[in-house]
C-alpha cells in the first residue's frame, strides 16, 4: 500500500472568513485524528478546547491540544476534531476526517473515492 499527500484547508467554525492556507498532509488511515501545525491553526483563530494524550508508533505517550475546525480537501468537507501538532510532529489527515468526507482511499490511484450514501431504513408505502 502506497501513501500520498493532499492539501488540506482548516476553517474557523466561528468565523468562516478565517482559513488556513493549504497545508500538505499525509493521508494516514492508521491515525484516528487529523494533525495540523498549531501555529497555522492559531493563525486562523482556531483554538484548542482540551488536551488529549496520544500514543506514538514508538510507544511514547504525548499530550497535544485538540480543537474543532471545518476541514476541506479534494472537494470534500467536514467538521472534525483537529490536533494542534508541534514542530517535529507529522502533518496527517486521519481516518475520522476521511469518514466525515464519506470517502474511501484509493492508495493505488492516490485519490479519494466518494462512497454512496447508505440508507439505514426505507419504507415504501
PLM feature spans:
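Pepsin/retropepsin-fold aspartyl endopeptidases
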Residues: 1-125
Amino acid at each position: 500500500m502506497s501513501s500520498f499527500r493532499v492539501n488540506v484547508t482548516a476553517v474557523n467554525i466561528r468565523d468562516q472568513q478565517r482559513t488556513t492556507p493549504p497545508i500538505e498532509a499525509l493521508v494516514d488511515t492508521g491515525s484516528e485524528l487529523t494533525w495540523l501545525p498549531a501555529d497555522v491553526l492559531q493563525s486562523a483563530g482556531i483554538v484548542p478546547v482540551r488536551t488529549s494524550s496520544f500514543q506514538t508508533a514508538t510507544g511514547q505517550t504525548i499530550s497535544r491540544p485538540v480543537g474543532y475546525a471545518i476541514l476541506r480537501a479534494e472537494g470534500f468537507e467536514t467538521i472534525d476534531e483537529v490536533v494542534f501538532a508541534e514542530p517535529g510532529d507529522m502533518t496527517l489527515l486521519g481516518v475520522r476526517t476521511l469518514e466525515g468526507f464519506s470517502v474511501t482511499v484509493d492508495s493505488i490511484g492516490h485519490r479519494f473515492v466518494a462512497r454512496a450514501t447508505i440508507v439505514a431504513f426505507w419504507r415504501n408505502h
